[in-house]
Amino acid sequence: MADNARAKRLADLIREVVAQKLQRGIKDPRLGSQVTITDTRVTGDLREATVFYTVYGDDEERAAAAAGLESAKGVLRSAVGAAAGVKFTPTLTFVADALPDTAKTIEDLLDKARASDAKVREVSAGAQFAGDADPYRKPESDDESDTAAKTDGDAAE
């Protein structure tokens, strides 16, 4: 079993080789400039590699890019094998990265929360407390502070 540093180096190499090959080496129109390799993970035995990608476009373009990656899997694996120089070239599995969709969902939720906060701020702009500003805090009188100072002074002696 390989160490984690070697698996990370191989994952980085696979990401770079696949990205370069997609840009320059593969003539499939489904794999145009809209496909981006976001991450690569390699198993501990260096036999399986999962390549995460994003596609900028609608669902049809995503499906076309997935089909294009599946058809180019052998060419990409050969390029990785030539560049890596390992005994066994990892089997490539392409997975659409859910990160952009998740980020968009989070951004939508944050925008909704900001709008709700702004609405609450508008409503409470001229509002006042129902009672005193802080009903649990009692003003300290001079008599109490003098007696506290005397008891502190008595304790010091």
From Swiss-Prot:
Start-end of Basic and acidic residues biased regions: 147-157
Keywords: Cytoplasm, Ribosome biogenesis
One GO MF term attached to the UniProt entry: ribosomal small subunit binding
Gene Ontology biological process terms from the UniProt entry: maturation of SSU-rRNA
Gene3D superfamilies registered for this protein in UniProt: 3.30.300.20
Subcellular location: Cytoplasm
Main location as per UniProt: cytoplasm
Function statement: One of several proteins that assist in the late maturation steps of the functional core of the 30S ribosomal subunit. Associates with free 30S ribosomal subunits (but not with 30S subunits that are part of 70S ribosomes or polysomes). Required for efficient processing of 16S rRNA. May interact with the 5'-terminal helix region of 16S rRNA.
NCBIfam families: rbfA
Name under which the protein is recorded: Ribosome-binding factor A
Organism: Streptomyces avermitilis (strain ATCC 31267 / DSM 46492 / JCM 5070 / NBRC 14893 / NCIMB 12804 / NRRL 8165 / MA-4680)
Lineage of the organism: Bacteria, Bacillati, Actinomycetota, Actinomycetes, Kitasatosporales
Gene: rbfA
